[in-house]
Amino acid sequence: MPTIIMDSCNYTRLGLTEYMTVKGVKKKNISLINDIAQLQNKCQQLKPGVVLINEDCFIHESDASERIRKIILQHPDTLFFIFMAISNIHFEEYLYVRNNLIITSKAIKISTLDSLLNGYFQKKLNLSVRHGTHSEVHPFTLSQTESNMLKMWMSGHDTIQISDKMQIKAKTVSSHKGNIKRKIKTHNKQVIYHVVRLTDNVTSGIYVNER
């Protein structure tokens, strides 16, 4: 199955290409592209197994996020990775925001990437496995209260203001903040903000558990 790498950085292209070839993907099956038009065409032509996208490639175009969203929806069997364009922040974790969409950064560990792509590589070797690690995939969700609170938090409200508006104790607000940080796997507010914004841009938003 083909692989697509959408990144304007030659160093990253080289690194990801080498990584994929070491894992057994032939170079002729790796497409290097720069923009969304190419991504759309290649996805339609090749039906890729994995697409690796640098957020920098689409954040500067006005309708780019909507186009990326449509591509992801149109290819449910393709595993998409979006590497956040976030500077001076070290984030080694990853988040499944949809069954076929992972948000991470270029600081992700090779061992983590290995585990996320393990099913894909097994499939390359014609082993009988489900696509990716989808049998174990559970996109992260927030409770309705956490979702409401996160919106206020990201809008600049502090704990006391959130406490007053939601009519809950400040201690409860702090507890919800802790849960959100745990689910997004970081204590860094800048990373949390970036993850939320990116998820809103390329999907319908973070899943909310309505129960």
Curated annotation (Swiss-Prot):
Against PROSITE patterns, the record matches this protein to:
HTH_LUXR_1 (PS00622), HTH_LUXR_2 (PS50043)
List keywords of the entry alphabetically: DNA-binding, Sensory transduction, Transcription, Transcription regulation
NCBIfam families given for it? PRK15411.1
Identify the residues that the record assigns to the HTH luxR-type domain, covering every copy: 135-200
Give yes or no: UniProt keyword Nucleotide-binding.
no
Q: What job does this protein perform? A: Component of the Rcs signaling system, which controls transcription of numerous genes. Binds to DNA to regulate expression of genes.
From the Swiss-Prot or TrEMBL record, give the protein name: Transcriptional regulatory protein RcsA
Keyword S-adenosyl-L-methionine in annotation? no
As for family, the record states: Belongs to the RcsA family.
Q: Which SUPFAM superfamilies match?
A: C-terminal effector domain of the bipartite response regulators (SSF46894)
| The entry's DNA-binding region | 159-178
| One of the GO BP terms on file | regulation of DNA-templated transcription
Q: Which InterPro entries match?
A: RcsA, Sig_transdc_resp-reg_C-effctor, Tscrpt_reg_LuxR_C, WH-like_DNA-bd_sf
Q: Which GO terms describe its molecular function?
A: DNA binding
According to its UniProt entry, this protein's organism is Erwinia amylovora
